[in-house]
Amino acid sequence: MSLKLDGKKLSLEIEERLNEYISSNKEIAKRAPGLAVIRIGEDPASGVYVNNKEKACSRVGIKSFIFHLKDNIEQKEVEQLINKLNLDKNIDGMLLQLPIPKKFDEQKLISHINPSKDVDGLNEINIGKLVKNEPAMRSCTPAGIINLLRSQNIKIEGKKIVVVGRSLLVGKPLSLMLLNLNGTVTMTHSKTLNLNKVCREADILIAAAGKPNLIDSSFVKEGAIIIDVGIHRLKSSNKNQTRLCGDVLLEDVISKVFAYTPVPGGVGPMTVTMLLVNTIFSWQKQFGLSSNLNDLLP
């Protein structure tokens, strides 16, 4: 039977440790950690994700500050808000909920976020430090995936790893992080020739293409580990209902793989948990708290 990599279970275990850590250090710091989330427009999925982050913050004792801006706001006004939050000593972490309306310069807004508060790890300073393998904020989804693998003692060093997808949010930073851990990484994308053949070489296959059910059994070798980053809401056979699926056609590959992540309940919860970790890391540095946060992770 294939091993289920249960991100929901692991995330709750880590959250419990984070809650204890904040409780034991809040008296020294004189305040709880603070996370600011900037949401622009009315994208329904963004609303769900922001709500999930707010709930997760509440569970561990982080104070969340939600800024929901109308999409008729100007770029300069958003930049001014970011600059204000950069100076706010009650804010340890800040993120721009993506996607945002196309009229905005997304990367320019992200570049305005102080790198020490950039809990999504998307500021060019943090990306540059990742390339150089220097300590910095790490992107949440890649960090969540690595901790999920570590929780089951799945080694990365020396493994052939194929990443399907090259986004700045997942594919690129994940590939760099795996390289820094001595994995042998191949990054693929929609233009890769013979994609299924390339994927069949993988000991660990990570699907982050953003295409529902792209990966079937023809992409997977016997005994591989498959990580599904995708999440899609599709119409079910009952037209009045929808169902969630990932980039992997799980029922087609499950008999071949050694381990897999479910959708939902796999990578998603760990992404949120690593956001909390990054926020607490920034809080810890500001107040010179001595405990090592890595001790709370797998």
From Swiss-Prot:
<comment type="function">
    <text>Catalyzes the oxidation of 5,10-methylenetetrahydrofolate to 5,10-methenyltetrahydrofolate and then the hydrolysis of 5,10-methenyltetrahydrofolate to 10-formyltetrahydrofolate.</text>
</comment>
<keyword id="KW-0560">Oxidoreductase</keyword>
<dbReference type="Pfam" id="PF02882">
    <property type="entry name" value="THF_DHG_CYH_C"/>
</dbReference>
<keyword id="KW-0658">Purine biosynthesis</keyword>
<keyword id="KW-0521">NADP</keyword>
<dbReference type="InterPro" id="IPR020631">
    <property type="entry name" value="THF_DH/CycHdrlase_NAD-bd_dom"/>
</dbReference>
<dbReference type="GO" id="GO:0006164">
    <property type="term" value="P:purine nucleotide biosynthetic process"/>
</dbReference>
<dbReference type="GO" id="GO:0004477">
    <property type="term" value="F:methenyltetrahydrofolate cyclohydrolase activity"/>
</dbReference>
<feature type="binding site">
    <location>
        <position position="190"/>
    </location>
    <ligand>
        <name>NADP(+)</name>
    </ligand>
</feature>
<dbReference type="InterPro" id="IPR000672">
    <property type="entry name" value="THF_DH/CycHdrlase"/>
</dbReference>
<dbReference type="GO" id="GO:0004488">
    <property type="term" value="F:methylenetetrahydrofolate dehydrogenase (NADP+) activity"/>
</dbReference>
<dbReference type="GO" id="GO:0005829">
    <property type="term" value="C:cytosol"/>
</dbReference>
<keyword id="KW-0028">Amino-acid biosynthesis</keyword>
<dbReference type="InterPro" id="IPR020867">
    <property type="entry name" value="THF_DH/CycHdrlase_CS"/>
</dbReference>
<dbReference type="InterPro" id="IPR036291">
    <property type="entry name" value="NAD(P)-bd_dom_sf"/>
</dbReference>
<dbReference type="InterPro" id="IPR046346">
    <property type="entry name" value="Aminoacid_DH-like_N_sf"/>
</dbReference>
<keyword id="KW-0378">Hydrolase</keyword>
<comment type="subunit">
    <text>Homodimer.</text>
</comment>
<keyword id="KW-0368">Histidine biosynthesis</keyword>
<feature type="binding site">
    <location>
        <position position="231"/>
    </location>
    <ligand>
        <name>NADP(+)</name>
    </ligand>
</feature>
<dbReference type="GO" id="GO:0009086">
    <property type="term" value="P:methionine biosynthetic process"/>
</dbReference>
<dbReference type="InterPro" id="IPR020630">
    <property type="entry name" value="THF_DH/CycHdrlase_cat_dom"/>
</dbReference>
<protein>
    <recommendedName>
        <fullName>Bifunctional protein FolD</fullName>
        <ecNumber>1.5.1.5</ecNumber>
        <ecNumber>3.5.4.9</ecNumber>
    </recommendedName>
</protein>
<dbReference type="GO" id="GO:0000105">
    <property type="term" value="P:L-histidine biosynthetic process"/>
</dbReference>
<comment type="similarity">
    <text>Belongs to the tetrahydrofolate dehydrogenase/cyclohydrolase family.</text>
</comment>
<feature type="binding site">
    <location>
        <begin position="165"/>
        <end position="167"/>
    </location>
    <ligand>
        <name>NADP(+)</name>
    </ligand>
</feature>
<keyword id="KW-0554">One-carbon metabolism</keyword>
<keyword id="KW-0486">Methionine biosynthesis</keyword>
<comment type="pathway">
    <text>One-carbon metabolism; tetrahydrofolate interconversion.</text>
</comment>
<dbReference type="GO" id="GO:0035999">
    <property type="term" value="P:tetrahydrofolate interconversion"/>
</dbReference>
<dbReference type="Pfam" id="PF00763">
    <property type="entry name" value="THF_DHG_CYH"/>
</dbReference>
<keyword id="KW-0511">Multifunctional enzyme</keyword>
